[in-house]
Amino acid sequence: MIGIGSSLLFDRRSGKGGSPIPQPDVYYDLSLKDNSSPTRNIIDDLSGNGHDAEIFNAAYTESSGYRSDGAFVFDSIDDYAIMQNVTKGFKTLFMEVIPSLTTDKSGFLYDQRVGRTSFGISISLNHIAYNTYNWGGVTYINGKLNTTMNGKEVYLKHQIITIVNGTDLKPQKVVLGGDIGLSGYFSNMALYKLIGFYDELTPLQIEKVINDYKLKYD
């Protein structure tokens, strides 16, 4: 397993420190590259499962590329990334992210929708944050179940989004920074980490992932 310490693996398998969690099926840490990296257009999957993501149209500047605080910024114009070798949808997904660097800018942060099933993560101003396209699922913000906070309250905030959805149908593609049809719903997010599981995690497991992977929020 790439990028995950052996002691941490032991703790998870043994259940030490609380509810055990499965190994991630995809894991990105955007702080590991910069705009001069030879493979800057590839987000490496640190889980070892081959779900690298290819970045398209980035200018590789602080406003469209990697920036010094460890994030990758999508410019909301045409930047996006596509996850590779996806055979089914993730049932639990974590994003450490600033969802939009400008106010009143909607768009998709992540999309694995199959028709009106599974989920996409988007900012919709007058709807429950990140839940508009999460059919049959639940949404957590900073580890807490969200049923009241709406989209206009999440701009500019460094936060942890967690989606739990029981549908694992294979999507046509998995897109970061835009919608699955690449039809213009690009986001202006700053993405720090992304972690996905084929399992539905419990609230205790969600808390453990946040702690183990040192996901941060304001």
Each model region followed by its residue ranges:
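Extracellular glycan-interaction patches encoded by glycine-rich segments
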Residues: 167-192, 201
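Acidic glycine-/aspartate-rich tracts in secreted/extracellular proteins
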Residues: 30-40, 49-50, 99-104, 114-115, ...
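Glycan-recognition/cleft segments
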Residues: 106-136
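Extracytoplasmic low-complexity segments
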Residues: 1-78, 124, 190-193, 206-218
